[in-house]
């Protein structure tokens, strides 16, 4: 990296050492420094330290947004949602543990995602005839939540079923 050799006869007439930079000369041998050596100093190949193996976290993220940024997304506890065909009904999100779940207004769901599918299921007024709803599924994007929506025909009215919910 450094060359501590004495000056060569070819360079004997030039000023060298710290005195050439304005400092006092201590009559030390010339210290030659090259840019290649400078990069070599900083390019020391340290051994990569691996973190100890740990059990997989409860959190996961299957979306590109938020994945690997230090903010893990919780594994969704919501498994499915069911809604009737009335315009003011709510889609009830039922947790996998059988809890009461959270209420999600149907109008918000309809405005956020699939359009005609939700309007067909949730936009009927009282007294209208119910059409035949075929089994259908599509991807729904609500904010950062992606769900697979299917329809099913019950004995009296069609229902919306959110079969899978991912974050």
From Swiss-Prot:
What residue spans carry the region label Disordered? 1-21
Give the protein name, as stated in the record. Uncharacterized protein TMEM132E-DT
- Report the source organism: Homo sapiens (Human)
């Amino acid at each position: 990296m450094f060359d501590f050799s004495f000056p060569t006869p070819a360079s004997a007439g030039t000023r060298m050492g710290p005195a050439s930079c304005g400092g006092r000369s201590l009559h030390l041998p010339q210290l030659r420094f090259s840019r290649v050596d400078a990069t070599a100093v900083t390019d020391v190949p340290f051994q990569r330290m691996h973190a100890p193996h740990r059990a997989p976290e409860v959190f996961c993220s299957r979306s590109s947004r938020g994945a690997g940024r230090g903010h893990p997304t919780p594994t969704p506890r919501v498994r499915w949602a069911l809604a009737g065909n009335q315009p003011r009904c709510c889609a009830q999100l039922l947790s996998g543990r059988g809890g009461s779940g959270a209420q999600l207004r149907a109008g918000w769901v309809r405005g956020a995602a699939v359009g005609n599918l939700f309007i067909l299921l949730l936009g009927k007024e009282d007294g209208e005839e119910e059409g035949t709803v075929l089994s259908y599924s599509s991807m729904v994007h609500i904010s950062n939540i992606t769900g697979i929506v299917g329809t099913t025909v019950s004995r009296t009215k069609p229902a919306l079923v959110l079969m899978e919910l991912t974050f």
